[in-house]
């Protein structure tokens, strides 16, 4: 069995996932870096994590594929024999105006729900036997305020995150006390994902009226994920909003 604690962060090639991988490595964890298509970026994350002194297991897996998820967790088990923290960060969306109902095809619905909703469930189900025997088994789902207030990149994305918030509560009841399950709900994140549709100026204007008038950074979310994993032992089934006070 691996001597160090182990964290698996899905979708950790870039952005919030990469920030989480580095943050846990700084805390002495060895890291499972998961990616679906972004191998070049995942290798960059691997190098950054290794620079913190951590060991890295790099695994390609589309979390919407249940069999692939089972294989990923099987590899973690065979290589390291433990898993202490699961961060369900992998996500996808399409930027579709909510009024454009006809643009939201069944194919888009299936892809978004597959990655954002089914994927976290598949990962928890596959990893539960490892998390149960950890001294502090923890699942943190990276959700969104879109799942709370219905404002987001598409109707399907909002629905997927609302579902993830509910799954968080259901699994917290089902898996406690051995495993805690919580969600972090960011607002707008200053990342390349959002910058596909917003300039820096537009993002600054969007957040200018918030009580804390700036967008979240990947490190803000990583710090929250770390807190929910290690900084509290009595919180489960909770949605922790990190959006500068927009959502109250």
Regions found by a protein language model. Name each.
Residues 124, 160, 168:
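Active-site helix of classical SDR
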Residues 124, 217-242, 247:
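C-terminal substrate-recognition "lid" of short-chain dehydrogenase/reductases
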Residues 82, 176-180, 235-237:
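Short, small/polar-rich loop/turn modules that mediate ligand/substrate recognition or access, typified
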Residues 13-14:
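Conserved glycine-rich cofactor-binding loop
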Residues 97-110, 206:
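Substrate-binding pocket helix/loop in short-chain dehydrogenase/reductase
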Residues 129, 172-177:
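Alpha-helical segment proximal to the catalytic Tyr-Lys
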Residues 144:
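Residue(s) in the substrate-gating loop at a strand-loop-helix junction
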